[in-house]
Each structure stands twice: as structure tokens, then as C-alpha cells.
């Protein structure tokens, strides 16, 4: 009898390798983000100690969905005319194609996941 804790067998030709990413050696994006682990359909990035800004960052639209989680600090997220304040422990979603921008209120650290991966094919530019 198979133990309930045993993982399902790998399918032939399927990549089942695990990848560990050390953020100290990860590439950085032009806006200050650190690119973390990335798979075929989702990628992670870290915004670390982003400093307050006056909110003059222009809004943008991306062809990927973003979900995020606030580790520390505070920011305002503006999406399609709506504003939410993000505090430690909050999470959020920015739908693909939605016009959005962030205004950092206090030194801000957050992790985001994007689907499809933001840094592939110039999506993050």
C-alpha cells in the first residue's frame, strides 16, 4: 500500500527538478526590484526598502497579473482610479492590463508574484 505522504511519480519528459535562488546573486530590474525564483508560468520578485516617493511615478499597464504581500512599510496602490493603502500583512492583486501605480508612504518591502513571468520577453519594461 502506498504511503499518503509519497509524492506522485514524475511523468516522463517532465522537469521535476527543484531550483533554489539566492537573492544575494539575483538580477535587479530597472525599477529596483530583485528577481527571485521563476517558473514557466509564474515568477517572484522582491521590492526591498523602497523609499517614500511623492507619487509622481506614472501609471502603467502590464500584460501580466500581479499578486503581492507586504512584509514591512506602507504604500498606496492606485488601480483604475481606485486607491487602497497597503500595510504589513496585506496582500493585493493587480489584474493584467489594469492601469496602476504605487506611492510608497514608508520604507516598503514586499514580495510579488507575476503570471506570466514579468521579466521574460521584456514584459517588465
Regions found by a protein language model. Name each.
Residues 23-59:
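A short glycine-rich, His/Asp/Glu-containing loop-to-beta-strand
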Residues 61-77:
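Short, conserved beta-strand element in jelly-roll/cupin
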Amino acid at each position: 500500500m502506498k504511503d499518503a505522504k509519497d509524492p506522485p511519480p514524475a511523468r516522463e519528459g517532465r522537469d521535476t527538478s527543484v531550483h533554489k535562488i539566492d537573492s544575494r546573486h539575483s538580477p535587479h530590474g530597472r525599477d529596483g526590484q530583485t528577481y527571485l525564483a521563476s517558473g514557466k508560468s509564474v515568477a517572484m520578485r522582491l521590492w526591498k526598502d523602497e523609499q517614500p516617493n511623492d507619487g509622481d511615478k506614472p501609471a502603467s499597464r502590464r500584460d501580466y497579473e500581479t499578486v503581492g504581500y507586504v512584509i514591512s512599510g506602507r504604500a498606496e496602490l492606485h488601480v483604475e482610479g481606485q486607491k487602497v493603502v497597503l500595510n504589513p500583512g496585506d496582500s493585493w492583486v493587480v489584474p493584467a492590463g489594469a492601469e496602476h501605480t504605487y506611492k510608497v508612504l514608508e520604507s516598503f518591502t514586499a514580495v510579488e508574484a507575476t503570471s506570466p513571468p514579468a521579466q521574460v520577453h521584456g514584459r517588465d519594461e
